[in-house]
């Protein structure tokens, strides 16, 4: 908007400033010789108003009017006195005539003080006075009279104008818009046209992603343009005057605007950022300043409704989420995104089946192996070193069906004639700024990659223009290939949910009908498609400036790069080292948003023409047109909800009720099954199957049972979509998106069950029904009873599979870095075969015993183990003596020799200070023979003293565990 130039007379009707009277100075009368100002002239501080001389010298002027000095020069007898202004203002009245003698203190001129209607950084544009440095005689700063309180220029909040001049400029803007038959569109950036993240982008070479820094030392930001963004802006700019309004910083807003509009043809200076916001929590505070005459011609598109306080002229946009785990980076303070940064699930469209299984890249994009990306941004790595320049992709291929043709007629918000006449949205909106590895920006090599290349400022415009025609033939092939890769319907047929477009919280896009996209529909075209892949990607370097690649645009990009802290080849050369992968971002919401805005524009000027013809008395207002068009979407629908919110919560406060009412639907609370009842429902929106309402509604043929995605799809398209595309399935609650607008979950999430708990919490073991066999001399546990697998020692349920503690054929993973012995079907001879369990300090650190208690218990265990070691030594020496004196009793000798093995093992473990309970393993033959021997000689080796010792040892070990 134009700003009044300095020196302009204040607008008529402005408040009258204080009028000051300038009086004749000095004690003696003065004669006025001449005026240096005229009535209506603007004066500044120090300007000469008049020239005087003393009145006494005027009486004797006839005799001695002048005298000759010694040098021969003539000078006046009395010096002239100049009257200077002490304040700035406008001369309203001259109270004396030249030649008149003015008495001391008489009024000479009446001066109206400057109202400072235009102020720039504290300086008045009318009088030039510095309003920040006015000092009064007592040293306190004066408060000057200034009427400049309105900031009308987006990016210059320091430029203030008076409210009267603001209204005058506002009326001029409205007249200009009416002459051009345009409206005003306030455009949000984050998650509306772009998606930005600070997270490391592993696929740095993904097409359509810009990598930049806002300053030295700042984190690298990665911005993805929404598909069809450039095409959307270029078409809407013909109907609307675009204004950018974002909660991002000023540098961020201008950098993103440079990506979207490098030639400054779409937004110009109309960029409003967080630094210019009056209210950091709301965007409505600046509307009064930007549009002093009201926002009756202003339409708003934003993904957030709260920041606009649910304004009636707001069109809610489906959130655009490309980077997983990142929401709105510039969300207002106190919002959910700024506090929790919750991960947003983003459903992406599925690809056409390929011979090899699809691969999921870290960005969450399903990609077909072996297919190079060709979405109109840049060439594959093998072609980027060539000399071909960027080529536009704005010309649609003749005969190629429009993307909107794949949707059912009931979903299209416009007529078939409008769809046929509308140009096809191109993929040129998804663009990326990168530099070929073999090129340096400072060398001026031919064919620098992109129209908007952050690292290039020496693009050759001549070669760029020369190669446009040569690559235009391959544009249609690349577009046709992407058209064939549209998502296919699910096997359920008409019951498939929408997956073809990116899903916004709670408002999914409906998929194509089953009959229109069969899995093998384009099978014959697969080989030509892959064969012409290289040719289809040769045009990949799509420009951001309407397909115009010239030097001026490259210079603009270079300036934006320097402003944002990205130097030539600093961060983008290395991004091309990785192999390009296909981008399958199938978000097409901007296509439907464009149709909605066209409908609003058409309806406004249809009413405006009627207003000019005196057919209607009231001028059209966007704030009434948007709700009126929106309320016609579901005007003949009666909705009843089931399972979307708690029963004790008022339904009027839910988002489903708010948006359904805005779409014109009638909300019912009681299900009426009679088809002839006047208050019967036509649609039942349920969150889960199996409820009483759902079972009753499914028996009625006139009632549509759909899931909540049907409502959000109607909202994002402003059209009643097909109910068959959104059936209610049993697993809908499980597959429900986390970013759904539904504010209340239907059920508490069940914690996931781990297949193997890394640190199971095992309380003190309880005596089980199994039989334990102990050694008669050492008191060690030899084995448990052969009544089946050993039961877990814990009686409390542990959140893991039962098989995680049992012996299974695959090797068990190591716990705490120790080797686990091989389990042998329940044969675990003693502590040497027992798995190490986590200690109390590892599982329950707050209940750990103190150091003194542990030392005391260790001492007791060492004493017990020492006694057992002495007994085992004596038992070991006994068979050695028996070998010297042969005896006929062989079973006894065999038994004693067998018992020597665990004793020596225990002695070596105690002497070497190894881990307690970590013993040498026995072979299967020893275990089998020992089991059979102990079963036959069990009664012979039992003693009361050994039993007491074994019980004491087991109790101590259980306490330690």
From Swiss-Prot:
Disease as annotated in the protein's UniProt record = Congenital cataracts, facial dysmorphism, and neuropathy: An autosomal recessive developmental disorder characterized by a complex clinical phenotype with seemingly unrelated features involving multiple organs and systems. Developmental abnormalities include congenital cataracts and microcorneae, hypomyelination of the peripheral nervous system, impaired physical growth, delayed early motor and intellectual development, facial dysmorphism and hypogonadism.
Q: Name one GO biological process term.
A: transcription elongation by RNA polymerase II
Domain BRCT spans what residues?
629-728
User: What is the taxonomic lineage of the source species?
Assistant: Eukaryota, Metazoa, Chordata, Craniata, Vertebrata
Q: What is this protein called?
A: RNA polymerase II subunit A C-terminal domain phosphatase
**Assembly and interactions?**
Homodimer. Interacts with GTF2F1. Interacts with WDR77, SNRPB and SNRNP70.
Q: Which reaction does it catalyse?
A: O-phospho-L-seryl-[protein] + H2O = L-seryl-[protein] + phosphate; O-phospho-L-threonyl-[protein] + H2O = L-threonyl-[protein] + phosphate
Q: What class of enzyme is it?
A: hydrolase
Instruction: Quote the gene name from the UniProt entry.
Output: CTDP1
Residues where N-acetylmethionine is found: 1
Spell out the Low complexity composition-biased ranges. 463-475
Name the organs or tissues of expression.
Ubiquitously expressed.
One annotated Gene Ontology cellular component of this protein = nucleus
Domain (FCP1 homology): residue spans on this chain: 178-344
EC number annotated for this UniProt entry: 3.1.3.16
- Renumbered residue ranges of the record's region Disordered: 328-589, 730-752, 780-949
Residue numbers bearing the Phosphoserine modification = 395, 674, 740, 839, 869, 872
Q: Is Acetylation one of the keywords?
A: yes
Domain of life, source organism: Eukaryota
Q: How is it modified after translation?
A: Phosphorylated. In the presence of TFIIF, the phosphorylated form has an increased CTD phosphatase activity. The phosphorylation is required for the physical interaction with GTF2F1.
Give one GO molecular function term.
Answer: RNA polymerase II CTD heptapeptide repeat phosphatase activity
Which organism was this protein described from? Homo sapiens (Human)
């Amino acid at each position: 908007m134009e700003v009044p130039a300095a020196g302009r007379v204040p607008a008529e009707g402005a408040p009258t400033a204080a009028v000051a009277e300038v009086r004749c100075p000095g004690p003696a009368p003065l004669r006025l010789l001449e005026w240096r100002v005229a009535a209506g002239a603007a004066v500044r501080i120090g300007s000469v108003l008049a020239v005087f001389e003393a009145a006494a010298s005027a009486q004797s002027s006839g005799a001695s009017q002048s005298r000759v000095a010694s040098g021969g020069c003539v000078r006046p007898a009395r010096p002239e006195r100049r009257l200077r202004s002490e304040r700035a203002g406008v001369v309203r009245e001259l109270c004396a005539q030249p030649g008149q003698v003015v008495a001391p203190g008489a009024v000479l001129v009446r001066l109206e003080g400057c109202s400072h209607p235009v102020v720039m950084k504290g300086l008045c544009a009318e009088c030039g006075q510095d309003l920040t440095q006015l000092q009064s005689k007592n040293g306190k700063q004066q408060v000057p009279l200034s009427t400049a309180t309105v900031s009308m220029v987006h990016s210059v909040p320091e430029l203030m104008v008076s409210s009267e001049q603001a209204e005058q400029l506002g009326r001029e803007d409205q007249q200009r818009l009416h002459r051009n038959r345009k409206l005003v569109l306030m455009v949000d950036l984050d998650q509306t046209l772009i998606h930005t993240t600070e997270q490391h982008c592993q696929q740095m070479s993904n097409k359509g992603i810009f990598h930049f820094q806002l300053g030295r030392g700042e984190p690298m930001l990665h911005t993805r343009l929404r598909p069809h963004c450039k095409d959307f802006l270029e078409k809407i700019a013909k109907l609307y005057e675009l204004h950018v309004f974002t909660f991002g910083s000023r540098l961020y807003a201008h950098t993103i605007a440079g990506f979207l509009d490098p030639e400054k043809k779409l937004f110009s200076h109309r960029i409003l950022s967080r630094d210019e916001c009056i209210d950091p929590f709301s965007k409505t505070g600046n509307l009064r300043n930007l549009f002093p005459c009201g926002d009756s011609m202003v339409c708003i598109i934003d993904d957030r409704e709260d920041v606009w306080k649910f304004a009636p002229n707001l069109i809610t946009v489906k959130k655009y989420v490309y980077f997983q785990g990142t929401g709105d980076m510039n969300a207002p303070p106190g919002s959910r995104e700024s506090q929790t940064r919750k991960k947003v699930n983003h459903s992406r469209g599925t690809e056409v089946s390929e011979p090899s299984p699809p691969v999921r890249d870290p960005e969450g994009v399903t990609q077909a192996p072996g297919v190079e990306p060709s979405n109109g941004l840049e060439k594959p790595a093998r072609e980027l070193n060539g000399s071909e320049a960027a080529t536009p992709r704005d010309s649609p291929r003749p005969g190629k069906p429009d993307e909107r043709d794949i949707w059912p007629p009931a979903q299209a918000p416009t007529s078939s004639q409008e769809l046929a006449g509308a140009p096809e949205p191109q993929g040129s909106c998804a663009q990326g700024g990168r530099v070929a590895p073999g090129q340096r920006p400072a060398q001026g090599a031919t064919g620098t990659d992109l129209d908007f290349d952050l690292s290039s400022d020496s693009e050759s415009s001549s070669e760029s223009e020369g190669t446009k025609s040569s690559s235009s033939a391959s544009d249609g092939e690349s577009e046709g290939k992407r058209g064939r890769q549209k998502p296919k319907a699910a096997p359920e047929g008409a019951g498939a949910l929408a997956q073809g477009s990116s899903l916004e919280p709670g408002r999914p896009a409906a998929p194509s009908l089953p009959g229109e996209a069969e899995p093998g529909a384009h099978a014959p075209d697969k080989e030509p498609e892959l064969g012409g892949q290289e040719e289809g990607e040769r045009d990949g370097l799509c420009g951001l400036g309407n397909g115009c690649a010239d030097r001026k645009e490259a210079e603009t990009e270079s300036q934006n790069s320097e402003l944002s802290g990205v130097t030539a080849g600093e961060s983008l050369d290395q991004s091309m080292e990785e192999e390009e992968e296909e981008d399958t971002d199938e978000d097409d919401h901007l296509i439907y948003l464009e149709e909605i805005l066209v409908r609003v524009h058409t309806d406004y000027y249809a009413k405006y023409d009627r207003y000019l013809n005196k057919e209607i008395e009231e001028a059209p207002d966007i704030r009434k047109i948007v709700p009126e068009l929106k309320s016609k979407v579901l005007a003949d629908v009666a909705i009843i909800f089931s399972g979307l919110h708690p029963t004790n919560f008022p339904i009027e406060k839910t988002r489903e009720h708010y948006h359904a009412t805005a779409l014109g639907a009638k909300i019912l609370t009681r299900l009426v099954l009679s088809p002839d009842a006047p208050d019967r429902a036509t649609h039942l929106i349920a969150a889960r199957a199996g409820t009483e309402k759902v079972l009753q509604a499914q028996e009625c043929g006139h009632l549509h049972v759909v899931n909540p995605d049907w409502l959000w799809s109607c909202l994002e398209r402003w059209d009643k979509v097909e109910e068959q595309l959104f059936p209610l399935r049993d697993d809908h609650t499980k597959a429900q998106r986390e970013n759904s607008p539904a504010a209340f979950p239907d059920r508490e999430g069940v914690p996931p069950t781990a297949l193997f708990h890394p640190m199971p919490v095992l309380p003190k073991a309880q005596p089980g029904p199994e039989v334990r066999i102990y050694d008669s001399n050492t008191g060690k546990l030899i084995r448990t009873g052969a009544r089946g697998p050993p039961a877990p020692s814990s009686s409390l349920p542990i959140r893991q599979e039962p098989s995680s503690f049992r012996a299974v054929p695959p090797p068990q993973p190591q716990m705490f870095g120790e080797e686990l012995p091989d389990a042998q079907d329940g044969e675990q001879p003693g502590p040497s075969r027992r798995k190490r369990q986590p200690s109390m300090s590892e599982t329950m650190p707050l209940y750990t015993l103190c150091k003194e208690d542990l030392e005391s218990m260790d001492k007791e265990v060492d004493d017990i183990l020492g006694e057992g070691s002495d007994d085992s030594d004596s038992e070991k020496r006994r068979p050695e003596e028996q070998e010297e004196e042969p005896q006929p009793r062989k079973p006894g000798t065999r038994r004693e020799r067998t018992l020597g093995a665990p004793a020596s093992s225990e002695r070596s473990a105690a002497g070497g200070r190894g881990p307690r309970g970590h013993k040498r393993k026995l072979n299967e033959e020893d275990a089998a023979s020992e089991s059979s021997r102990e079963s036959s000689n069990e009664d012979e080796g039992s003693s009361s003293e050994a039993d007491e010792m074994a019980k004491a040892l087991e109790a101590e070990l259980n306490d330690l565990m």
